[in-house]
């Protein structure tokens, strides 16, 4: 079955989030999944190899967690544990008021390039705001505002960059997946039209040259 035209050119929001949820994040688990057994000779408990899995997964960290000891798991697992109140999610280092203000300043001071941000920064921010708002040290409403400011500044720079668009390429380094996904349909159609104009101009030029030679 053929996909709708708009899904042939871009990822759907669900597809974008699915890709991003495969990224690793740090958590503080509130449960212990590491198993122990009693040493009959010494009367003590020792760590042993896991005989079962919390989930059907190869994620060793997931099956070796100790309560309140930080570990790293896939984002989708962290969200599942968070939903069950079994962990706290540690916000990325760039997702603080201090760092966002610094990124905004960099974007403002450099009109010809974008500051370095993770490829998934917008999706990560929105997911954590929605699912783990209580895990942030900074007020979430202020973080949302800064993320929106940063996004709008970058969108303005993108529009300025489109003035440099030609039939061969457009260089927009450091854009995130979501930003590129939003721009792609417009850019693809515009570049296709520019190629048509370019090819048409070359063809017309060739015909004119031929007529001049015959004359």
UniProtKB/Swiss-Prot annotation:
Main location (coarse class): nucleus
Keywords: Chromosome partition, DNA replication, Nucleus
Nucleus recorded as keyword: yes
Subcellular location: Nucleus
Gene3D superfamilies associated with the record: 1.20.58.1020, 3.40.5.50
BP term (GO), one: nuclear DNA replication
GO cellular component: a single term: CMG complex
One Pfam short name: Sld5
Signal is among the record's keywords: no
InterPro entries, per the entry: GINS_A, GINS_bundle-like_dom_sf, GINS_Psf2, PSF2_N
Stated family: Belongs to the GINS2/PSF2 family.
Listed PANTHER family: DNA REPLICATION COMPLEX GINS PROTEIN PSF2
Primary role: The GINS complex plays an essential role in the initiation of DNA replication. Has a role in chromosome segregation.
Subunit structure: Component of the GINS complex which is a heterotetramer of SLD5, PSF1, PSF2 and PSF3.
Name of protein: DNA replication complex GINS protein PSF2
Organism ancestry: Eukaryota, Fungi, Dikarya, Ascomycota, Saccharomycotina
Gene it is expressed from: PSF2
């Amino acid at each position: 079955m053929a996909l709708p035209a708009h899904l042939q050119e871009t990822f759907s929001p669900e597809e974008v989030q699915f890709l991003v949820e495969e990224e690793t994040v740090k958590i503080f688990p509130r449960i212990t999944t590491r198993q122990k057994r009693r040493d009959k000779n010494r009367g003590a408990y020792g760590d042993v190899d896991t005989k079962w899995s919390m989930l059907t997964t190869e994620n060793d960290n997931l099956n070796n967690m100790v309560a309140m000891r930080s570990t790293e798991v896939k984002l989708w697992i962290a969200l599942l544990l968070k939903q069950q109140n079994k962990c706290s999610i540690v916000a990325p280092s760039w997702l603080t008021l201090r760092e966002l203000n610094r990124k905004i300043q960099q974007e403002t001071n450099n009109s010809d390039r974008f500051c370095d941000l993770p490829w998934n920064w917008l999706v990560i921010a929105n997911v954590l705001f929605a699912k783990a708002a209580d895990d942030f040290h900074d007020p979430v409403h202020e973080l949302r505002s800064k993320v929106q400011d940063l996004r709008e500044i970058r969108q303005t720079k993108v529009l300025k960059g489109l003035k440099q668009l030609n039939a061969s390429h457009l260089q927009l380094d450091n854009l995130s997946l979501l930003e590129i996904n939003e721009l792609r349909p417009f850019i693809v159609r515009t570049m296709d039209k520019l190629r048509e104009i370019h090819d048409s101009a070359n063809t017309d030029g060739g015909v004119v040259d031929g007529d001049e030679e015959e004359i």
